[in-house]
């Protein structure tokens, strides 16, 4: 099944609009707006440099990090802001603003999926090397099943133990 072609500009514009709507009322700390606008600036960088693997990778990692920060900030500030605006004139605006922030948070994993697909299309390969664990797509050390080479060190092989 082929993935639908999603425009990077549409993703950046959607998250920008939802971030602006989420910041309409002052219920979230400035860290929310700064983090999301910074990541959207990386998205603009990825739009400007179409062949850059680094730009799309930084945007992808930034989106993943803002998922975590958004969850943390919503968990810390939502209930207090909801109580403060419950009986005030800004109740509906708070509901709209918080709804747009939550909708942005729900769209971010889907955006990350499309960003990863674009990253792979641009030629990016993700390598993880933790010393003892290596996750990569480098298959140069694999042997073909049809042409198996004999093991090199048959003489240095330890004898089997008898128990």
Swiss-Prot record:
InterPro entries linked: AGTRAP
Organism domain of life: Eukaryota
This protein's UniProt keywords: Membrane, Transmembrane, Transmembrane helix
Topology relative to the membrane: Multi-pass membrane protein
Cellular location(s): Membrane
Transmembrane regions listed in the UniProt entry: 29-49, 56-76, 96-116
A single GO BP: angiotensin-activated signaling pathway
A Pfam family: AGTRAP
GO cellular-component term (any): membrane
Residue ranges that the UniProt entry lists as topological domain Extracellular: 1-28, 77-95
Positions in the Cytoplasmic compartment: 50-55, 117-163
SMART domains given in the database record: AGTRAP
Protein role: Appears to be a negative regulator of angiotensin II type I receptor-mediated signaling.
Protein name according to UniProt: Type-1 angiotensin II receptor-associated protein-like
Biological source species: Xenopus tropicalis
Source species taxonomy: Eukaryota, Metazoa, Chordata, Craniata, Vertebrata
């Amino acid at each position: 099944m082929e993935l639908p072609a999603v425009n990077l500009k549409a993703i950046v514009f959607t998250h920008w609009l939802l971030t602006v709507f989420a910041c309409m009322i002052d219920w979230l700390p400035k860290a929310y707006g700064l983090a999301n606008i910074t990541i959207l600036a990386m998205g603009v960088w990825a739009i400007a440099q179409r062949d850059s693997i680094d730009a799309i990778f930084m945007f992808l990692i930034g989106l993943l990090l803002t998922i975590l920060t958004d969850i943390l900030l919503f968990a810390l500030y939502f209930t207090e802001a909801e109580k403060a605006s419950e009986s005030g004139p800004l109740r509906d605006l708070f509901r709209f603003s918080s709804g747009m922030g939550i909708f942005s948070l729900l769209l971010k994993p889907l955006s990350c999926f499309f960003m990863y697909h674009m990253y792979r299309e641009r030629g990016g390969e993700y390598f993880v090397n933790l010393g003892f664990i290596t996750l990569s797509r480098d298959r140069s050390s694999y042997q073909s099943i049809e042409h198996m080479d004999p093991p090199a060190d048959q003489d240095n092989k330890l004898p089997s133990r008898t128990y």
